[in-house]
């Protein structure tokens, strides 16, 4: 059972974070939080999203899960005002979630959880390098890199104390180095991995709204992006597998 009220901004930020990677997911809820963990169809990227009950203006729930069609939730956006309060309600055993705001009432059919890809296990991999930069800065580099290539290198250069993003195309290239004064660095450890820009553009659009994004990185390992939503009452983690170039 779930009965909750949430602002339109937080609702949209949450749905957008999920839709950057997946079209459907299991949504879990308990007395204290709502959470989802899902991978894309190619098993290349993962999202782990949590909203504490404090993200809601009203929250009442018992432990359970439902299968969400994220595209259907996005279809409700067009009628939402920025100041709208969104009422969400699901009765235990029902196959619908009720979404109500400003006189509108959507009754959205749920997906069978058994038909949705199983929740992935959170990876236990240790990524030695870590930097924190603004989400908008990160997205700007990704957009610029997409003009010249479909892939981008992320690197930490400890000797220079720089976090470097660069892309190489057939004839052009782009490089952006963030100095120690531009980033918050927890670990200036050597790191360098190559990633698909297609995935990063979708993630980056979501991350562009975050004041700070923490990036954990290794050598030819996945990258992890962590950032807050809902005024600090929510957390999103994206993990993206590297592209391995043939010698």
UniProtKB/Swiss-Prot annotation:
Please list the GO terms describing molecular function: DNA binding; DNA polymerase processivity factor activity
Pfam families named among the record's database cross-references? PCNA_C, PCNA_N
CDD domains, per this entry? PCNA
Q: Which GO terms describe its biological process?
A: leading strand elongation; regulation of DNA replication
Alphabetically list the UniProt keywords.
DNA replication, DNA-binding
InterPro entries, per this entry? Answer: DNA_clamp_sf, Pr_cel_nuc_antig, Pr_cel_nuc_antig_C, Pr_cel_nuc_antig_N
| Keyword presence, S-adenosyl-L-methionine | no
The UniProt entry's coiled-coil ranges are none
Q: Does the keyword DNA-binding apply?
A: yes
User: What protein family does this chain belong to?
Assistant: Belongs to the PCNA family.
What is the role of this chain?
Sliding clamp subunit that acts as a moving platform for DNA processing. Responsible for tethering the catalytic subunit of DNA polymerase and other proteins to DNA during high-speed replication.
Share what the entry says about its subunit structure, partners included: Homotrimer. The subunits circularize to form a toroid; DNA passes through its center. Replication factor C (RFC) is required to load the toroid on the DNA.
Q: Which PANTHER family match?
A: PROLIFERATING CELL NUCLEAR ANTIGEN
* The protein's name in its UniProt record: DNA polymerase sliding clamp
Organism of this sequence: Methanospirillum hungatei JF-1 (strain ATCC 27890 / DSM 864 / NBRC 100397 / JF-1)
